[in-house]
Amino acid sequence: MKILFIAPRYSGGIGGHAARVAEKLQEYGFDVKLMHAPHLPIKKLKNPSFVLLSSLKAIIGNERYDIVHAFNVPSAFAMKYTKSKKKVLSIHGIYSEQVNALHSKTIATAAKITESKVLDWADKLTTDSKIVKKMYKEKLNVDFEFFYAPLDIKKFSKLKNIEKKEKQVIFIGRDSFEKGIDILKKIETKINGKVVYCTNTKWDYAMENLKASTILVVPSRMESIPQVIKEAFYLKIPIIATNVGGIPELITNDKTGILIPPNDPEILQNSINELLADNKKSKILANNGYEFVINNLTWEILLPKYVKFYEDLVNS
């Protein structure tokens, strides 16, 4: 089977997920290629320039595919013009709401109009969260198929042996409004430990810092399914996270982690300090999280579902 994946980049977020899926499908025997298109390295022009240049690349390209799979709305334009039997669009999170939280009303309105149009271009729509699937059905009456993004546990064997740093609290993610990093920074001086931030680092470096930490904090205002939660589960690092988006699909409060409301610095501060002081609870949460990820979210568990999805689609 010949498949083309399209994403603005193939590291972090949905693009990182695309790269991981491509790698596993290639190992399985599928012929998967990644489209690489340039974009202007200017904040507000990154996506528009990617849309233009990737679409142009698709229009002039002669290669034909069984399936073209676009990851996020900006990739859908190149998907539309790629020569293929079937088209798939994956969205992690409600795209128009993400844009609305980060940009002006004009841009947000344009994103909302664009979102409703591009969804019609795909033969199949997929997402990594039950809540996103539900919200798109309610909002636009469109049907998404749902697949969790698996965790590749084999990669962790490459990490160095790291010495634990007592009472180290870590944030891993983009330095952006929706990730809530400003909320954690606001209370940093009141936390009974050291806070470290991994905001634009290589995966190995971030994971080694996570492995050394006592608690992972995910203070997001908006989320789909953060991959870092699965990574912390596997490394047996207890988690405090906001109960937004798909996070409650992974974290059961007081069982596999601690859930708190978003935008509440005081509750975040108290939750961190209480867990730093409770080693027994930390160990219980860490062990439960590990069992959850091993039993539900590895490639060994989920790869057959991905393979079946592509085979069923190309044969339909």
Can you say where each PLM-predicted feature lies in the sequence?
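Conserved donor-binding/catalytic core segment of Leloir-type glycosyltransferases
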Residues: 163-179, 185-188
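Active-site proximal beta-strand in glycosyltransferases
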Residues: 67-69, 82-99, 126
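Aromatic "clamp/platform" in nucleotide-sugar-dependent glycosyltransferases that forms part
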Residues: 221
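A short, well-ordered alpha-helix in the C-terminal region of glycosyltransferases
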Residues: 267, 274, 281-296, 302-308
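Membrane-proximal helix-turn-helix segments that form the acceptor-binding/catalytic region
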Residues: 56, 106-125
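Conserved acidic donor-binding segment of nucleotide-sugar-dependent glycosyltransferases
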Residues: 253-254, 258-265, 274-280
